[in-house]
Amino acid sequence: MRQSSDNRQNLYLYNTASRTKELFSPSNDPVKLYTCGPTVYDYAHIGNFRTYIFEDLLKRILLFFGYSVKHVMNITDVDDKTLAGACKNNISLDTYTAPFIQAFFKDVATLHILPADAYPRATHYIPQMLVAIRKLLDDGIAYIGQDHSVYFSIKEFPSYGKLSQLQLQNLQCCSRIASDEYDKENLSDFVLWKAYDKHRDGHIYWESPFGKGRPGWHLECSIMAMELLGPSIDIHAGGVDNIFPHHENEIAQSESLSHQPFSRYWLHSEHLLVDGKKMSKSLGNFFTLRNLLDRGFSGAEIRYMLLQSHYRMQLNFTEEGLMACRQALKRLRDFISRLESPYPESATISEGIDQCGQRFLQDFSNAIANDLNIAAALASLFDFIHQTNSRIDQSHFTQADSHYVLDILKKINTVLGVIPFSTSLEIPSEVARLVEEREIARKEKNWKQADVLRNQIASFGYVVEDTKSGPKVKKY
């Protein structure tokens, strides 16, 4: 990878719009990044977090290469699903979505995802959406249907389909669709303002010049992005399932309003499979983050699992894969522990370790600059660990070398966010509960129960050691 004229390494990203890898060149500083966030009708599942981890990696790599970033991630707190949930439970929309929003932020922290600069909620931008709908109506791009909903006329946007590479003139279009989500076979005019239906919507609606109702999902993102980042942004990211219709419709709305390109780069992560199959509650392979935490896996292990594959490849999520990630993190933890051992004092870094470190940093940078190739970056990391361990084994290692290697690891961890520098373990709540129960059993001299609990703790990948100061929990 070459360096750019401003001494910043060239970064290449696969642009869904062109179906090619392109040299990243932002319009201005900071980079304007918009990512599709959660629809808070339920707890986010690991498929969602595969996308959020990819978006976090993208942001971290931009920061690593010296870009400043203004990041907006939306929260969809009104759509078909959130409305249905609130009505079913006969509560307000805010009351229904609040626990899922709170859980989302807790999950983000658990997975060490860097916070966005703003998390706009759709319900906070209704007035701006109404202004946009009025303009689209006045320009003849939108119309009011017989059901009193407002629709975007896709024939009024000649380049409709350019992101998903649909040829509009070759498709059989139905008249209109009011659902937020649909597939290409149901290509149609899409809803901007969904008219109120008492039986469907209960007590939830907003007043508007077009009648009671609520905004369409696609319009929400367009307005929040343009309000917070301006009419044209640098990168819009999400999952492949967002390409059509969501991102396609965002482009149509936004560019009809601003007459400017909405986003210069479009990045999309592939689907996550569980044991080779699509995740489904009916198949029993549907997992939220808290499901996995309750089974004894840590946030770092789950992050590593979701991080390790290239974002444009499907990720097969398995328990065996999680166990392998646990071992990879143990190898990192053991390496750091070894680096923190005492070594001979030296005022300078050994030439061999300096060359090894510089070569690794270049290989790591080249990998992530090539469309976020994290698999190659991780391979270079473990090769660096192997080479460093060999020098330690040969007693060709000093205290200065140790500090140098640790500094390199801290630098690349600004990208990875998984290297366990802290010696304190992140103990899952279920393991902590079992340790507490075992301690009670020991105090009651119920040795049989204590052994049963020890085995249960071991099944989560932890070992408990009894010391004078109390139980100590370690990973295998």
From Swiss-Prot:
It is found in: Cytoplasm. Keywords: Aminoacyl-tRNA synthetase, ATP-binding, Cytoplasm, Ligase, Metal-binding, Nucleotide-binding, Protein biosynthesis, Zinc. It catalyses: tRNA(Cys) + L-cysteine + ATP = L-cysteinyl-tRNA(Cys) + AMP + diphosphate. InterPro entries: Cys-tRNA-ligase, Cys-tRNA-synt_Ia_DALR, Cys-tRNA/MSH_ligase, CysS_C, Rossmann-like_a/b/a_fold, tRNA-synt_1_cat_dom, tRNAsynth_Ia_anticodon-bd. It comes from the Bacteria. ATP binds at K281. Its cofactor is Zn(2+). GO terms for molecular function: ATP binding; cysteine-tRNA ligase activity; zinc ion binding. Belongs to the class-I aminoacyl-tRNA synthetase family. This is Cysteine--tRNA ligase. Transmembrane segments: none annotated. Binds 1 zinc ion per subunit. Zn(2+) binds at C36, C221, H246, E250. GO terms for biological process: cysteinyl-tRNA aminoacylation.
